[in-house]
């Protein structure tokens, strides 16, 4: 446990921001640099089957220390950080024994205030790790990596704690939706796994959005503005019309819980061609299909109003709700719940309003719910984590490993 924070503060010094514009895997060189450093650490822990492949997938195993059959379980985390904010030159602040009030984030002019982030009100007396207001922190998901490795180190140092084979997997490019693309489930060797990629203490998740990307491409005609009358068709005006046709109350900022949404995430604008990048999210397959149909209907309406072929829609499914793949294996949820309760953590079962590697892995034959890291406000400069939350995550991983072995003892 004593090295947990030290590990984390070291890991966030690696710039591992993934790059959606690069089709290589991993999409950024910093991820390989980080993976190579982690590999050395896993070798130093005397784990077996330590391997780092050319695509940046790092795997290892802690062998069973019991003399009866126990299913191999896995713990998975991702090495990249989100492209939404810089992950370079991260300068964490450690706030000991937080007593309330606003936390200034370095000299950036940014701050964490309870009025904007009410979770702070429940964290009095905790030790917080924040950013300096210029970068994200990288708790998503380097906290998960630090917690997994710290739990494995604890099990190595305490061989009286019984466990079966424990498989470890660290993936690249999760934040850009590719984390599981080249994950070798058979090589990994676990019967089921858990991503350690959740937020506040207690989170246990096995439902996530069905996800589709939707690109709306608007075609115009560019003519010199001085002679444009009756000739120019400005694709930016078409794009603006399309956005105004979308349901205004079905966006991320207007939805919560099990509500789905449309999200205009990017726009590339020009007179001759404009492209709007949307993501569609819904917890039900039927819901996401209905949302696709709504977008197609809006495209058809615009084409009828303007000129056929001015607007086109390209839909790409990204991932699906893991619930249908995890629910038949209720014991893996129950083991995680009981491990949390044993560690004085109240399980908070809630849907993931996003996706994880576990969603894709579940459809690849590796059921994979998600467990908390203790972090908050991922993907931005206001990200922070509590040291106590990280410690509780380590305890849950250790207890879950032990409880699985006990469960299968005859």
Swiss-Prot record:
Keywords annotated in UniProt: Aminopeptidase, Cytoplasm, Hydrolase, Metal-binding, Metalloprotease, Protease, Zinc
Main location as per UniProt: cytoplasm
List of residues binding Zn(2+) 2: 140, 175, 379
Catalytic activity: Release of the N-terminal residue from a tripeptide
Cofactor note: Binds 2 Zn(2+) ions per subunit.
Subcellular location: Cytoplasm
Keyword Transport (UniProt): no
EC number(s) on file: 3.4.11.4
Gene Ontology biological process: peptide catabolic process; proteolysis
Gene Ontology cellular component list: cytosol
Cofactor: Zn(2+)
Residues annotated to bind Zn(2+) 1: 78, 140, 197
GO molecular function, one term: tripeptide aminopeptidase activity
Cross-referenced PANTHER family: PEPTIDASE T
HAMAP family reported for this sequence: Aminopeptidase_M20
Alphabetized NCBIfam families for the sequence: peptidase-T, PRK05469.1, PRK13381.1
Family named by the database record: Belongs to the peptidase M20B family.
Function as written in the Swiss-Prot or TrEMBL entry: Cleaves the N-terminal amino acid of tripeptides.
Protein's recorded name: Peptidase T
Species the sequence originates in: Vibrio atlanticus (strain LGP32)
Organism lineage: Bacteria, Pseudomonadati, Pseudomonadota, Gammaproteobacteria, Vibrionales
């Amino acid at each position: 446990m004593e090295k947990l924070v030290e590990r984390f503060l070291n890991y966030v010094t690696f710039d591992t921001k993934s790059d959606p514009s690069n089709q290589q895997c991993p999409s950024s060189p910093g991820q390989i640099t980080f993976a190579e450093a982690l590999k050395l650490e896993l070798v130093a822990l005397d784990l077996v089957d330590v391997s780092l492949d050319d695509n940046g997938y790092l795997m290892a195993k802690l062998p069973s220390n019991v003399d009866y059959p126990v299913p191999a379980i896995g713990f998975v985390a991702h090495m990249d950080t989100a492209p939404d904010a810089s992950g370079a030159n991260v300068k964490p602040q450690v706030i000991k024994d937080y007593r309330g009030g606003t936390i200034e984030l370095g000299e950036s002019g940014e701050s964490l205030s309870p009025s904007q982030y009410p979770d702070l009100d429940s964290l009095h007396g905790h030790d917080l790790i924040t950013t300096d207001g210029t970068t994200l922190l990288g708790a998503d998901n380097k906290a998960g990596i630090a917690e997994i490795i710290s739990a494995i180190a604890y099990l190595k140092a305490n061989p009286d704690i019984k466990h079966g084979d424990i498989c470890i997997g660290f993936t690249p490019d999760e934040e850009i939706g590719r984390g599981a693309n080249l994950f070798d489930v058979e090589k990994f060797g676990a019967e089921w796994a858990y991503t350690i990629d959740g937020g506040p203490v207690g989170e246990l998740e096995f439902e996530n959005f069905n996800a589709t990307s939707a690109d709306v491409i608007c075609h115009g005609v560019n003519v010199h503005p001085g002679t444009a009358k009756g000739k120019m068709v400005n694709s930016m005006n078409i794009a603006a019309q399309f956005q105004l046709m979308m349901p205004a109350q079905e966006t991320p900022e207007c939805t919560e819980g099990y509500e789905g949404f449309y999200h205009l995430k990017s726009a590339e604008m020009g007179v001759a061609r404009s492209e709007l990048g949307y993501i569609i999210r819904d917890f039900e397959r039927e819901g996401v299909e209905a949302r696709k149909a709504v977008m197609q209907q809006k495209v058809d309406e615009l084409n009828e109003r303007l000129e056929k072929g001015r607007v086109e829609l390209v839909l790409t499914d990204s991932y699906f709700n893991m619930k249908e793949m995890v629910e038949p294996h209720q014991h893996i949820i129950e083991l995680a719940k009981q491990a949390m309760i044993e560690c004085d953590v109240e399980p908070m079962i809630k849907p993931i309003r996003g996706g994880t590697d576990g969603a894709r892995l579940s459809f690849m034959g590796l059921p994979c719910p998600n467990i908390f890291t203790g972090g908050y406000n991922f993907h931005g400069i206001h990200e922070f984590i509590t040291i106590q939350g990280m410690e509780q995550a380590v305890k849950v991983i250790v207890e879950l490993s032990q409880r699985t072995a006990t469960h299968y003892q005859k």
